[in-house]
């Protein structure tokens, strides 16, 4: 599973919607995107955690984590689109460490992170199997992977 050969097309679409990216996330989540991020993160991260925000976009998941811990976590933003990472300054007083790349090839050490966040992004992996393996590699043995995403229904609602 994963996007496979469609990944380039999806990346092109994501690049095009950068100006309205947050509005699109809100729309497709029926206005519940912030609520879902808060519910997923609250109580699951601790002060001092090292966090990888995989598929970070503008960094909304990271911003939520920083708000919940009063800034007492260490964040690394990671996204395939450099323009997304460059536009994170509107959310952060001090810009977190950031890198550009895909789920399947994280430029991180083995067991480097206490927590990996993936908000509305895992569905865009090239290869879901490889992405899961790579996230497992960079997570500490007792680490947590917090995923907020939407699925595609098998049938349309009539």
Residues of each region from the PLM?
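N-terminal, positively charged/glycine-rich alpha-helical extensions of SAM-dependent methyltransferases
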Residues: 1-20
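Conserved alpha-helix/loop element of class I SAM-dependent methyltransferases that forms part
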Residues: 31-47, 64
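Short glycine-dipeptide loop
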Residues: 47, 139-144
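Class I SAM-dependent methyltransferase SAM/SAH-binding core
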Residues: 52-105
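A short acidic, Gly/Pro-enriched loop at the edge of an enzyme's catalytic core
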Residues: 104-116
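A short SAM/SAH-binding and catalytic strip from SAM-dependent methyltransferases
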Residues: 115-127
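A short glycine-rich, Lys/Arg-flanked "PGG" loop and its adjoining helix->strand segment in the class I
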Residues: 129-141
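Conserved class I S-adenosyl-L-methionine
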Residues: 146-158
């Amino acid at each position: 599973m994963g996007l496979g050969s469609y990944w380039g097309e999806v990346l092109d679409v994501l690049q095009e919607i950068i100006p309205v990216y947050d509005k699109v996330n809100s729309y497709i989540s029926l206005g519940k995107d912030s609520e879902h991020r808060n519910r997923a993160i609250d109580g699951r991260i601790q002060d001092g955690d090292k966090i990888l925000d995989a598929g970070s976009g503008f960094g909304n998941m990271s911003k939520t984590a920083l708000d919940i811990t009063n800034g007492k976590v260490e964040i690394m933003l990671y996204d395939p689109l450099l323009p997304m990472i460059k536009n994170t300054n509107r959310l952060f007083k001090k810009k977190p460490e950031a890198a550009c790349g895909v789920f399947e090839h994280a430029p991180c050490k083995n067991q480097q992170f206490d927590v990996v966040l993936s908000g509305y992004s895992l569905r865009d992996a090239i290869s879901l199997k490889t992405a899961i393996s790579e996230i497992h590699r960079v997570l500490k043995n007792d680490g947590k992977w917090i995923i907020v995403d939407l699925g595609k229904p098998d049938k349309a609602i009539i």
